[in-house]
């Protein structure tokens, strides 16, 4: 997706600076594909190795710190250069901009299938007007009848406010500036951390929507059968005015929807390359995996997403979950020279929130 306007403004029209933020995206996409095995985040240059990119990005980030701080290192030692308050401020300002440059692409990949993301400025709230999904009543009438059943539709207005979220990490200025702690690696881990938490919150909002007592029972299936799933999919599709549906769930949830072995599998035979393929859809309806997310608890090694729910959504209709990001990432920290080991606690602040708000009809299957 295009670079955010705030990043372009932060670069100040400097093409070299803008290339640094584009390079961070390239490095991140390469890492997610080569190390995490997650493709589709975005295109990247595969002619340069990941290790080489990491070193180049670290140096490019330090150059950007020089530009933003207005304090070029020149022939100064790292110790002397790092004493400048401007250098410390610029380091985290650049890190914040790097996070904002990469994060939108990661969100589209992980939650974009069911979440619509919006960006607002600091101090702003997001306002929505939800239009009714129902159609007008068509009735038979005699030749002399002047009016039929009168129907008036009303839109619903909703407001949404972001909530501040924080990450506190300890860094050592000397190690960062001397290359012992890689800035590119630090940014990458920060992006993954924020994206994981946003993924969990967006999914929890979706899960809470169908668990709500007011969610129609006609759109819930307790247990899976092909016939009932087809009926539910047809219902959702019809009430969304023909918008094609898809089945969404974690890999384990989707697995329980695969064809029964006793009924046979779909087999593709070719004289040169015979193969057996897993069915990727049901009657031309797609089956889409929602990537599972770790809870982050290394005592239980739990998973955050429900492995027993499959959601039936119309992909062409309005998305059921809305997300908002307020402003850009901000960081506050104590001074490195307040501690003997030149360490600093840096707290990154990211304001975002999610809400279930849509006129679309959706269903859920418990498997």
Language-model regions, residue ranges each:
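Sequence/fold signature of self-assembling virion shell proteins
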Residues: 54-58, 263-367
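Assembly/oligomerization interface modules of large self-assembling protein complexes
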Residues: 76-165
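Extended, solvent-exposed, turn-rich assembly/linker loops in the middle of proteins
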Residues: 211-283
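Alpha-helical scaffold segments that mediate packing/assembly in large oligomeric complexes
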Residues: 164-239
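Short, charged/polar micro-motifs that form catalytic or ligand-binding hotspots
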Residues: 47-51, 55, 76-89, 173-184
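Intrinsic-disorder-associated interaction segments
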Residues: 1, 10-17, 21, 50-54, ...
